[in-house]
Amino acid sequence: MAPNHGALLYEGKAKRVYYTDNSDEFLVHFKNDATAFNAKKHAQLEGKGSLNCEISTEIFKLLERNGIATHFLNLEDDCWMLVQRVDVIPIEIVIRNIASGSLCKQTPIAPGTELSRPLMDLYLKDDVLEDPLLTEERIDLLNLLSSSQRKEIQRLSLRVNDCLKEFMKGLDLLLVDFKLEMGFNGSGQLLIADEISPDSCRIWDLKTNDQDDRILDKDRFRKDLGGVLEGYSEILRRIKAFNS
């Protein structure tokens, strides 16, 4: 059952954000929509919203336990999350540990190559422009971040990566890469926002060497492999088994 909420603030490809009676809090509803290639590919997968909401909840709690502040406040229902209000930075932060996806299209690095160190790529959040890659000069030109803010984002992103990589390893999972969004709350604190789920991460199963079977994330949808919900469910199952 949906919790009480106010008017719709924003609807994206995978979530809706609603006002609440507290001006410092929002309610986020995770949708069952599956999209890829900037929503050029679209489907409805019953139960996907609930899986992403629960997985994000567990990961946000993990980060909080490790001293990394997030916008998460409470899981209100199976696909509803109460979060702090933040001013989201219009930048997508992608941390890469293993070469995959666009990195392999833009460089000669072979898919599956372990990178010598985590690579941080920044992208402008703009669907019309299809989220172009940003350079430091472009960030300065667009006045998106100060130098100190860029350094803080990098520091925080790498902390998240260290925490998630170690956690995933304990679940026999490999964190290939993932997307983060961040924002500032009313006190000016930088928080991890949005979601961290198989929609925003590439996660491989270390229990198999099969290049298709090991995929447990949205690449199953992108590549028409089927079993999208089964992959997401397996990630949640391992998280819950670890926490029990």
Swiss-Prot record:
PROSITE patterns: SAICAR_SYNTHETASE_1
Recorded coiled-coil stretches: none
Keyword GTP-binding: no
Reactions the enzyme catalyzes: 5-amino-1-(5-phospho-D-ribosyl)imidazole-4-carboxylate + L-aspartate + ATP = (2S)-2-[5-amino-1-(5-phospho-beta-D-ribosyl)imidazole-4-carboxamido]succinate + ADP + phosphate + 2 H(+)
CDD domains, A to Z: SAICAR_synt_PurC
Enzyme Commission identifier(s): 6.3.2.6
Keyword flag Nucleotide-binding: yes
Pfam families assigned to the protein according to its UniProt record, in alphabetical order: SAICAR_synt
Superkingdom: Bacteria
Xref: InterPro entries: SAICAR_synt/ADE2_N, SAICAR_synt_PurC, SAICAR_synth, SAICAR_synthetase, SAICAR_synthetase_CS
Keywords, sorted A to Z: ATP-binding, Ligase, Nucleotide-binding, Purine biosynthesis
Pathway noted in the entry: Purine metabolism; IMP biosynthesis via de novo pathway; 5-amino-1-(5-phospho-D-ribosyl)imidazole-4-carboxamide from 5-amino-1-(5-phospho-D-ribosyl)imidazole-4-carboxylate: step 1/2
GO terms classed as biological process: 'de novo' IMP biosynthetic process; cobalamin biosynthetic process
An annotated Gene Ontology molecular function: ATP binding
HAMAP family: SAICAR_synth (MF_00137)
Record family assignment: Belongs to the SAICAR synthetase family.
NCBIfam families recorded: purC
Protein name as annotated: Phosphoribosylaminoimidazole-succinocarboxamide synthase
Source organism of this protein record: Prochlorococcus marinus (strain SARG / CCMP1375 / SS120)
Recorded name of the encoding gene: purC
